[in-house]
């Protein structure tokens, strides 16, 4: 089935799912699964923090737009995630977690990706939302009229660019509290570990307790997936593989300023905040130790993925150990995560780490946000490129 038709077929199915839907024409079934996050205490006022470290948490300020604090945003705490698997699979022996990009609120573009991965690998694909993204974000953050007012206010601020109703909510939140970038990632990390524990205990329907775990990470989802692979929580990911698409660079080598992602002031604030943290290593170590206490995690791996120059030896030592289980694809015209940034990170700058990295250039207009556009004029070329990427991905993860 050609890509644009597949996209429309899957979107209709996902949009109308209640709990489980079988698509006989595509030989797959889709499930909507319930999840309750246990990581909400990260955002509570009462959470104890190291003496003198209040600036790192910046928590909690009154929640932008909804009038409540982050830890009380119910959509972020209790939500559904999707899974897709081949029809007739009573108990999946393999899982691929698919993690999305920054500031995304709809899964639409990922449906064909998940379908092809399931069809070609025979594994169950789990589309799991990062904290405060997708259906974990309040509806108000997608209200175009409300967000347009915020965008206009932000556009009138000095030294700002690329403000839009699409990025208004996340830009306002990150400029107000840049540490949210870290805390939302940490909550998602805890959620992943909780879901994995549930799988191992046999609580997840149609998934074997001993199922293998692999990852497909796009954009900031690649950043998160790489962190998981480096950390290897509870030694669960010793044999896991990761495919990176349009991602894989340290944060300082990304250029997320876009009307679809975040505006200039938000990007600058986040970058400056973490640069200041990294420049005071003893204080940063204390803060990270506080948040990672009780978790089987090397607290410095997160810091090593923020900046090329900080924790470089730690990052490259770990990448040497796991590079054979990573395959990355970058796009020539990707201005958000340029191939040069991906190469510098995954191959160690001078190329002394043999991580597989393919750099592609498609035969139609594309960008980071829309690598496979729904475009009647270029539908044949888009289908060809989509199938190439999915075939390479599936071959590595099968």
PLM regions and their residue ranges:
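Low-complexity, serine/threonine/proline-enriched polar segments
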Residues: 12-45, 131, 149-160, 165, ...
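Conserved alpha/beta-hydrolase "nucleophile elbow" surrounding the catalytic nucleophile
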Residues: 217-219
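Phosphate/oxyanion-binding active-site loops and adjacent basic polyanion-contact surfaces
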Residues: 73-77, 181-192, 378, 382
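Hydrolase active-site cap/lid region
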Residues: 203, 207-211, 215, 226-296
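Serine-hydrolase catalytic core
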Residues: 263-398
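N-terminal cap/lid segment of alpha/beta-hydrolase-fold proteins
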Residues: 19-90
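Short, surface-exposed "cap/lid" segments of acyl-processing enzymes
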Residues: 84-161
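Alpha/beta-hydrolase active-site loop
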Residues: 143-206
